[in-house]
Regions:
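Activation-segment/catalytic-loop signature of the eukaryotic protein kinase fold
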Residues: 1-89
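Short, small-residue alpha-helix embedded
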Residues: 89-98
Length: 150
């Protein structure tokens, strides 16, 4: 979400605590996160950036379904790192730059990166998320209106 003051909203939550219901809640939460990333990317791209690739790190990279979701919901290619500990590798890149081993962070990244597996967005699948994204934006607008009442 490209609004640092936004709060989370869950719509349609029921008292059903069955396994299937919890799976649906988990999936819709993941979709919400992916749409939040899409919102941030759109804000950046509207302000002069041209982001079309996401380099992801962390535990969620172990879930191919989430990586597919991020690609399809954002329309960006997703690069999953080959490094086992990509976050630590990134920290090492910053440290190597600070220690003067590289002239800048970009040079450290180019020299130390270990590549990754690139997953392309599926445009046909992405259009399924357009409706969800319109709902996402409308819920954000409504949440802002509620905040103004306070």
């Amino acid at each position: 979400m490209a609004d640092p003051h936004a709060v989370g909203v869950v719509s349609g939550l029921t008292l059903d605590s069955s396994f299937d219901s919890l799976c649906k809640l988990y999936w819709r939460t993941a979709v919400g996160i992916a749409l939040g990333v899409r919102h941030v990317l759109e804000a950046l791209n509207e302000n002069g950036y041209l982001i079309d690739t996401l380099h992801v790190t962390g535990g969620h990279t172990k879930n191919p379904l989430l990586m597919e979701l991020y690609a399809d919901a954002t329309g960006c290619a997703v690069v999953e790192p080959l490094a086992d500990e990509a976050v630590l590798l990134g920290t090492g890149m910053v440290a190597a730059t600070a220690a003067g081993l590289f002239p800048d962070l970009n040079a450290a990244c180019v020299a130390m990166q270990q590549g990754g597996k690139k997953r392309a967005a599926n445009p046909a699948a992405g259009t399924r998320f357009d409706r969800d994204y319109r709902i996402f934006l409308e819920m954000h607008r409504q949440r802002q209106a509620l905040d103004e009442i306070r």
